[in-house]
Amino acid sequence: MAGQEQQSSSPREEEHEVADAPVPVPSSPQASAHTDGVDDLLDEIDGVLESNAEEFVRGFVQKGGQ
């Protein structure tokens, strides 16, 4: 096996063509409002977790045979 070279069946010159990246579409006011609502919700969750994460997690822990 020493001295044997493996040859690829496809030539190296043919590289995979890279697809053009999609052009970002300007967001509509409705989409922007939706994103703002999600951001507000995530900020609220972050606030709850920062202030009382232990209590928040305890609410999801199973107790006994529940």
Swiss-Prot record:
Query: One GO biological process from the UniProt record?
Result: proteasomal protein catabolic process
Q: Where is the composition biased (Low complexity)?
A: 1-10
Protein name listed in UniProt:
Prokaryotic ubiquitin-like protein Pup
Q: How is it modified after translation?
A: Is modified by deamidation of its C-terminal glutamine to glutamate by the deamidase Dop, a prerequisite to the subsequent pupylation process.
Pathway assignment reads: Protein degradation; proteasomal Pup-dependent pathway
Give one GO molecular function term.
Answer: proteasome binding
Family membership noted in the UniProt record? Belongs to the prokaryotic ubiquitin-like protein family.
Query: Keyword annotations for this protein?
Result: Isopeptide bond, Ubl conjugation pathway
Whose protein is this, by species? Renibacterium salmoninarum (strain ATCC 33209 / DSM 20767 / JCM 11484 / NBRC 15589 / NCIMB 2235)
